[in-house]
Amino acid sequence: MKKFLIAVVLVAVAAVPACTNKQGETEAPVFITVNIQLQPGFVDVGTPAPVQIQTMVLSSHLKSSAASDPQGFATTTINTYIVHFRRTDGGTRVPPDQTFGCGVTVPSNGTATLSNFPILPVSAIQAAPFDQLLPFNGGVDRETGKTEIHMAWDITFFGQTAAGQRVQSETASGGLLFVDAAVTPESRKVKR
């Protein structure tokens, strides 16, 4: 009975997930938060243009409230960011993860404001699954049967401090609705 009880306790301990500190996952003395104030929300796939975020604010926070950085060794240079997409309308086809370069400096315990940074290039909007929404392709998403595609996106920034320690930001998210503004219910009826 004693061995059985020990085995049950060990299984229970192994099954319980451990707590994690996302800000502690990098060796840097800072962590970066992302605040997205204005999101595009609506994207007309009939107009070839990149999807951009009007304003994002990156904020640097020292992990230890008792720490200071008078020499600026915790100043962070952001080199790249990755955008991941997922469907929220029941469909499965999404564009591949997008990786963009950037050269943004975030002072230790300071902020940097990013304006009009892209999250989806024009070439991705003109490819699957968005191309199905264009009139000459039927104007309907084949997976859902709808004239629109609902998608969420996640953005994460990567860089290093002036001291060379890697930094990964928290992940921020948003939502997008893709439609072709030129496709109306009447224009779809004519094609059938």
Report residues per predicted region.
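Non-catalytic macromolecular-recognition regions in eukaryotic signaling proteins
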Residues: 19-192
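Sec-dependent bacterial lipoprotein signal peptides
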Residues: 1-19
